[in-house]
Amino acid sequence: MSTREGSLWGGRFADGPSDALAALSKSTHFDWVLAPYDIVASRAHTVILYRAGLLSEEQRDGLLAGLDSLAEDVADGSFTPLVTDEDVHAALERGLIDRVGPDLGGRLRAGRSRNDQVATLFRMWLRDAVRRVAAGALDVVGALVAQAAAHPEAIMPGKTHLQSAQPVLLAHHLLAHAHPLLRDVDRIVDFDKRAAVSPYGSGALAGSSLGLDPDAIAAELGFASAADNSIDATASRDFAAEAAFVFAMIGVDLSRLAEDVILWSSTEFGYVKLHDAWSTGSSIMPQKKNPDIAELARGKSGRLIGNLAGLLATLKAQPLAYNRDLQEDKEPVFDAVAQLELVLPAMAGLVGSLTFDVQRMAALAPAGYTLATDIAEWLVRQGVPFRSAHEAAGAAVRAAEQRAVGLDELTDDELAAISPALTPQVREVLTIEGSVSSRDARGGTAPARVAEQIDTVAATAARLRERLGGPA
């Protein structure tokens, strides 16, 4: 049987918890990351207790000095949890009491419960963590923009269903991976509006009767406001689920980018060469250069999706207010952040180090009769109904297939036999350069439009980075 040492409860219990219960309840192996935030919140709580007349000036100063000492020891690693500490809160209270004594140290817990305490600390930690994740995502965007700017006119095969479809600019394709990541970061910016609400002062569920000021401590801790409902504040974790969704979405977006790198670096595609520093070899096949970063990023996305699904499953069907199930809310989110902090810099480095074989991409761009749509649209511009234009373009593809030639290799007579409207002027669009240049509407793959996209994406990334408090 365990003792109650290291617990914040026990007066009505004759015996300590069973060893099995103590082992199950223990959370210091993952919630210790909240320790710096716990101490910051305890400093603010000390000041609020003093303002409420629950501490003398001497007691306030003694607690603050003890908390400062504890913070230094936590930071340098000289104070860590003991095996008997149930959680981060119990460990830090023990550390504070060691420094200021049980009478003074025992006063800090007045007016707060672990329920409102951990809900607040989780929000504090997560508001910082999402900024780190966002910065990493913007670094990947920066790498994509740099590659796009370095290849402003390179043309490649655009694909749908993984089949050659229409020529597009490489820069256009790269920016198509940047835009989803920008939306992910924008979600993080928006997320903070809901995360910046402080549960502190809600107590276990009903609020405090000690005259504390939730708004004051919210402001002290950098929150925009205090919670309007103490039950909701202590029991809700939708903020964590929202963050977990964004993390999973980033993982999915990275996975799609990773899949392109994996395909493009294969012998069959041959679009890119991997840098030695950002690839691995084989233990048995000397010739191999493997896209492990991309494959690991693709694999991590499943883990991030699993973290989201697990968290949502934990939250469902819990009655109000707080339930101990919520001990399980942090590990999925902590893990998601840890995985992204590994994957994002690796993906930024991988993308930035890619060497593109622009000649091969250009040579493959017209393969598979990707200029057929250009024929149809050229005919429409000549006044031919699209249904007829589509039929004529399809007939041109069939004729080229029968001769095993490209569309541009059909003779003027062959084109005229397909449709009298197919005059020699159609050859203006039977080049990949003419094809991409013709797609000049907003969002299109024409060089002028893609150049605008590069500037827009770079400016958006800089604006988001500034809003998140980082360097542009």
Curated annotation (Swiss-Prot):
One of the GO BP terms on file: L-arginine biosynthetic process
Location(s), subcellular: Cytoplasm
Family as reported in the entry's similarity comment: Belongs to the lyase 1 family. Argininosuccinate lyase subfamily.
EC id: 4.3.2.1
Catalytic reaction equation(s): 2-(N(omega)-L-arginino)succinate = fumarate + L-arginine
Keyword hit for Amino-acid biosynthesis: yes
Pathway assignment: Amino-acid biosynthesis; L-arginine biosynthesis; L-arginine from L-ornithine and carbamoyl phosphate: step 3/3
Chief site of localization: cytoplasm
GO MF annotation list: argininosuccinate lyase activity
Keyword Transmembrane: no
Record's keyword terms, sorted: Amino-acid biosynthesis, Arginine biosynthesis, Cytoplasm, Lyase
Name the record gives this protein: Argininosuccinate lyase
Chain ranges passing through the membrane: none
SUPFAM superfamilies the UniProt entry points to: L-aspartase-like
Annotated InterPro entries: Arg_succ_lyase_C, Argininosuccinate_lyase, Fumarase/histidase_N, Fumarate_lyase_CS, Fumarate_lyase_fam, Fumarate_lyase_N, L-Aspartase-like
Pfam families given in the database record: ASL_C2, Lyase_1
Domain of life per record: Bacteria
Organism: Mycolicibacterium paratuberculosis (strain ATCC BAA-968 / K-10) (Mycobacterium paratuberculosis)
GO cellular component, one term: cytosol
